[in-house]
Amino acid sequence: HTLLIHGLVQRPLVFSLANLLRYPMRTQVYFIECAGNSGALTRPDPAQDTVGGLHGLLSNSEWTGVPLSTLLDEAGVDPRGKWVLAEGVDAAGMSRSVPLEKCMDDALIALFQNGEAVRPEQGYPMRLLLPGYEGNINVKWLRRLKVTQGPIHTKDETSKYSELMPDGTARQFTLALGPKSVITHPSFGMKVPSPGFYEISGIAWS
């Protein structure tokens, strides 16, 4: 498996896992949340379910990897480059356009999750990590990063991860997820035994 960086760069580069393991790494803890998390609440007849059933499409892990900015600096980004196409090697060929500004900020090429190599189902040997962005854009089994002038409008950005607006147009690239919070106790299906004072608790994340 290799990672190719090409497009609007001065030096196209190819990295193996062994190559990347020699680079300085960064470790951080953060959430990955599915773009469809809590989506059941937007239906005309919202689903009646537990907190986990309604809001559970997220996870929190410690990720370790090479800052993407390090690799892009080594490749030498052309001044015309404003976006980066990230492509996975999965059967669906998942591909998403990422603003270059985000790639140069806090993006990681993640090699480890919770202190061990990223597992196959999580994108082994490497995946893209974009803190604060919707889950699908954190491309697994990453094989290619192409620096481009604008977004590519891949099938995953036109047929799936776009939002149909009331006027019939589609809104694209609403990539960042805002802060969210939910009440976890009492949860759906629970009943308080009698009138009185009860503690309400929950979690918040961003």
Placement of each model-derived feature along the sequence:
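Structured, non-membrane catalytic/scaffold regions adjacent to prosthetic-group chemistry
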Residues: 1-206
